Amino acid sequence: MRKLLISLALAIPVFAVDHNLLQKGYEVYKKHCSACHIERATPEQIKKFRMMAMRGEKLPIAAPPMNEVSARVKKFYPGELEFITFVKDYITNPSREKGVCMPMAFKLFGVMPPIGKALSEEEKEAVAYWLYHNYKESWKEMMRKMHGKMMH
């Protein structure tokens, strides 16, 4: 029991969230990302957006919601370091080839502009960190809520 408690005590800092970095990331999001990406959409809203798109209607959003972006990127890059590395690279040099969006997202929104080129390394790190830690829902869970069943 004592070994378990010591192990847990040593592991806590590894899993702790840096709230200052999280706040800085949110500030970067508000300043540089929120013009196109809304912060969060419910599964019902996302489903509504998809139905509108299928009918050829103009969407009330300019890019996928950030909670959907986070869940989708985590599907391919589940670890924090790999997620942050991907996001920092993608926002600096976005392309359809390295993107992980659903094909419909590229059709509706195209490839995002390279906003990362206007950000410092610290800002890119912060916004990627915020995107990773701010949203907990997995892609599978998001799809299950939208469709009422498990999807892969």
Curated annotation (Swiss-Prot):
Taxonomic lineage from the root: Bacteria, Pseudomonadati, Aquificota, Aquificia, Aquificales
Protein name as annotated: Uncharacterized protein aq_1854
Keywords from the UniProt entry: Electron transport, Heme, Iron, Metal-binding, Signal, Transport
Signal peptide segment: 1-16
SUPFAM superfamilies: Cytochrome c (SSF46626)
Ranges where the Cytochrome c domain occurs: 20-135
Residues passing through the membrane, by range: none
Gene Ontology MF annotations: electron transfer activity; heme binding; metal ion binding
Alphabetical list of Gene3D superfamilies matching this protein: Cytochrome c-like domain (1.10.760.10)
InterPro entries: Cyt_c-like_dom, Cyt_c-like_dom_sf
Binding-site residues, heme c: 33, 36-37
